[in-house]
Swiss-Prot record:
This is Probable pectin lyase A. Disulfide bonds join 81-100, 90-224, 321-329. Residues 1-18 form the signal peptide. It comes from Neosartorya fischeri (strain ATCC 1020 / DSM 3700 / CBS 544.65 / FGSC A1164 / JCM 1740 / NRRL 181 / WB 181). It is found in: Secreted.
């Protein structure tokens, strides 16, 4: 029996040790290596996970279970506000940095009780690969922060869930700000208080967001309808962002919001089921969208578009892409969705000389992305 036990343990170790980065980043973050060939470590506590992610060593960190941060930093009860009403499906807001006081002075005041761990994510330092084993790697109640000059980071095959979903300003799933060479791949996010993904106002430089499942189903939302509003916010001052192969489901807005000075290549993504809008493009947002599928998205882009947008409207117009991207852009596909037709070409030269993700026909996306995006589908 002792030998059988030892063999079982050895088998588990061998299985765990087999976890490594799958594939390679396409697009702007091509070449990212994360922790490289560092010996994998397997945190067993939330404290170990925080330590591994936040130290100065190159690391491959493998998650084999759920790391639940709920309650680890206590709770706060304070006065917040109800900008969207007090119905049971409406999000309430924490008065973070006097947000309620300054921006929603007429909103009813309410008592809010939130988990402190969720309000600020785990710091991720440079040269890290954070990988999940199978479908078992979950971070619950706290997000990730890639900030302050961090670079060369891979986050792959994990889930981030349940971050104060009732409260705006309750926390973000993934924050990137003042960073470079970041690859977010096969990650599932669900039940998040604020943004599922946010690139802050400092330069995040080269970022690839691929094969992720952004799940906007929530019991609480700013639109009070079960559709999360705060999806993806790209607001950097000098950002090159590739979004490819993502499944963006059940949002009512900001999926994504693009502004600042952000060049976005949105290619082969699947947007499904929105009660509001998908794209919001502000000043300094430059968006090329090709080979995507929009299903049941009544408003694909909110008006007005204050930045620039190329929607790859037809095969003739799309030939202009060849000069700058090295291929003819793919048309997008639509099902029970609104219009999406704009052909600003002045910004396309910004793609010249960059690492550009390949593009497939939208018909491929329709059949493959929902079944292949997110954790455990790698």
């Amino acid at each position: 029996m002792k030998y059988q036990g030892l063999l079982a343990i050895a088998g588990c170790i061998a299985s765990a040790s087999a976890v490594s980065v799958s594939g390679a980043a396409e697009g702007f973050a091509k070449g990212v290596t994360g922790g490289g060939s560092a010996t994998a470590v397997y945190p067993s506590t939330t404290a170990e996970l925080v330590s591994y992610l936040g130290d100065s060593e190159a690391r491959v960190i493998v998650l084999t279970k759920t790391f639940d941060f709920t309650g680890t930093e206590g709770t706060t009860t304070a006065t917040g506000c109800a900008p969207w009403g007090t119905a049971s499906a409406c999000q309430l807001a924490i008065n973070q940095n006097d947000w309620c006081t300054n921006y929603e002075p007429d909103a009813p005041s309410v008592s809010v009780t939130y988990d402190n761990a969720g309000t600020l994510g785990i710091t991720v330092k440079s040269n890290k690969s954070l990988l999940g084993s199978g479908s078992s790697g979950v971070i619950k109640g706290k997000g990730l922060r890639i900030v302050s000059g961090a670079s060369n980071i891979i986050i792959q095959n994990i889930a981030i869930t349940d971050i104060n979903p009732k409260y705006v300003w309750g926390g973000d799933a993934i924050t990137i700000n003042n960073a470079d060479m970041v690859w977010i791949d096969h990650v599932t996010t669900a039940r998040i208080g604020r943004q599922h993904l946010v690139l802050g106002t400092s330069a995040s430089n080269r970022v690839t967001i691929s094969n992720n499942y952004f799940n906007g189903v929530s019991s609480y939302s700013a639109t009070c309808d079960g559709y999360h509003y705060w999806g993806i916010y790209l607001d950097g001052s000098n950002d090159l962002v590739t979004m490819k192969g993502n499944y963006i489901y059940h949002f009512s807005g900001r999926s994504p919001k693009v502004q600042g000075n952000t060049l976005l290549h949105a290619v082969n993504n699947y947007w499904y089921d929105s009660s509001g809008h998908a794209f919001e493009i502000g000043s300094g947002g430059y968006v090329l969208a090709e080979g995507n599928v929009f299903q049941n998205i009544d408003t694909i882009v909110e008006s007005p578009v204050d930045g620039q947008l190329f929607t790859s409207p037809d095969s003739t117009t799309n030939k202009v892409c060849s000069t700058y991207l090295g291929h003819v852009c793919q048309v997008n596909g639509f099902g029970s969705s609104g219009t999406f037709s704009q052909a600003d070409t002045g910004f396309l030269s910004n793609f010249a000389g960059k690492n550009i993700a390949s593009a497939s026909a939208y018909t491929v996306v329709q059949s493959s992305v929902p079944s292949s995006a997110g954790q455990g589908k790698i």
